[in-house]
């Protein structure tokens, strides 16, 4: 089973990576840092856009772990952009059955902020027929989710 961790933090060694490490510990996985890719906003088309490269890597994975810091009361812009751009690009069954996990961390998030992120990722999974396993916001939750990975 192949696992892809998509790091939506601009910090490659930050808290999002550390929290994801609790979920991914002992597993073989590939990591994709969104900060390394040019992914333009929905509706913009440029020759150097690398969005489809990310989608192809997602297609190859059996399980996807999506990680984001909580910035300005929500998920990072790079993660939001990835989700937004997916609409109309992913064929109906391309992601069907893939497991999706969400790692979401911040300094002192409110329950409303966490619920909004969880809802958004859960709806994304539902739209594409993915098996949403849930969200981890701390080490204990990440280790519990790891049982399903």
Task: Indicate residue ranges for each PLM-predicted region.
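N-terminal beta1-alpha1-beta2 submodule of the flavodoxin-like/Rossmannoid cofactor-binding fold
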Residues: 1-91, 122, 126-133, 137-149
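Short, glycine-/small-residue-rich phosphate/pyrophosphate-handling segment
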Residues: 96-135
């Amino acid at each position: 089973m192949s696992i892809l961790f998509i790091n939506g933090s601009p910090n490659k060694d930050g808290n999002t990576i550390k929290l994801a490490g609790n979920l991914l510990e002992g597993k073989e996985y590939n990591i994709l840092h969104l900060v390394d890719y040019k992914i333009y906003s929905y509706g913009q088309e440029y020759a150097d856009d690398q969005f489809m490269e990310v989608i192809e890597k997602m297609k190859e994975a059996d399980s996807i772990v999506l990680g984001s810091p909580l910035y300005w009361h929500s998920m990072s812009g790079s993660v939001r952009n990835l989700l937004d751009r997916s609409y109309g690009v992913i064929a109906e069954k391309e992601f069907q059955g893939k497991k999706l996990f969400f790692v979401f961390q911040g300094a002192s998030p409110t329950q409303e902020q966490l619920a909004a992120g969880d809802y958004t990722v859960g709806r994304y999974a539902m739209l594409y027929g993915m098996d949403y396993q849930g969200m981890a916001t701390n080490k204990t939750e990440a280790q519990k989710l790891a049982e399903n990975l």
